[in-house]
Amino acid sequence: MEKTILVGLVNRNQDHKKCQEYLDELEFLSFTAGGTVAQRFTQRIENPNPATLIGKGKMDEISTFVKAMDIQTIIFDDELSPAQEKNISKILKIKVLDRTNLILDIFAQRAKTSYARTQVELAQCQYLLPRLRGMWTHLERQKGGIGMRGPGETEIETDRRIVRDKIALLKSKIKTIDKQMSVQRGNRGKLIRTALVGYTNVGKSTLMNSISKSSVFAEDKLFATLDTTTRKVVIGNLPFLLGDTVG
C-alpha cells in the first residue's frame, strides 16, 4: 500500500464538518486506489495561494511530516491548477494528486471493456494536456522525421501534439464503438429498458445480481463498476432489460 496524506480546505463555502466528510470519502478513494492514509491536514483559508493552494506555514508543516514519515503521495481534495501541481511537487518531491486525478486513476484500474478503457484514456489525456509543461511524461519524444513537424520543434510542443493526436484518435474510436452499440441496441427489439442508478458503492451491482440472478462484479469500494452491464429480467411475466450503471 502506498503511504499517502490528504489535504482539505475550510472556507466560507465549506465548514470544518463538511471538509471532514469530503476527506472521509477521499480516504476511501485512496484506499480503493491502493493507498493508506497516514495523516490528514486541513487549513482555513479564504483566498487560496495561487502558487501552492495552501499557505507557506501549512506547506512547511506538511513538508516536515512527509520527510519524517516517508510519505509517497499527497492528495488534495480541491482541484489543483497545473502550476500548483508543479510547484507543490517541486517543494515536497513526492507524487501530487487532486481528487480528479485520483478518480481517473481508479477508473484506469477498474475499466474492463474496450469502450470503458478508451473513455478513461481520453479523460486522462484531456487532464494531462494542460499539465505537460515542466512534467516528465511517458510520451515518446521525437523531433523531426516522418510525420513530425521538424527538427526545430521543442520537446513540450512535441508532447502536446502527440497528446492532441491521441485525443483525436480516441474520440474517433469512441464514435465507432457508439455506432456498434447503437446497432446492438436495435437488435434487442422493443423490450422495455430500465437502469439502476445511484451514488457509487450504494449496492447497485448487488441488487442487479439479486434481481437478475447473475454475477455482475460487486465490491465494497468506490467506483467498483465502470462498465455498464445489461441483463434480461422477467418479473411477473413482464420481460425487460435491466442495466447496471457506473459506480
Go through the PLM ranges and name each one.
Residues 1-4, 135-247:
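Conserved G1/Walker A P-loop phosphate-binding module
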Residues 13-17, 49-52, 110-114, 155, ...:
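Flexible beta-alpha connector loops of hexameric P-loop NTPases
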Residues 122, 126-139:
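A charged, well-structured terminal subsegment
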Residues 1-105:
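N-terminal accessory targeting/assembly segments
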Residues 26, 125, 163:
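A residue-level signal for conserved active-site and pocket-lining positions in enzyme catalytic cores
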Residues 16-19, 52-56, 78-79, 111, ...:
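Conserved phosphate/pyrophosphate-binding and hydrolysis machinery centered on Walker-type P-loop NTPases
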Residues 102-120:
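Short alpha-helix plus adjacent loop in nuclease-associated cores
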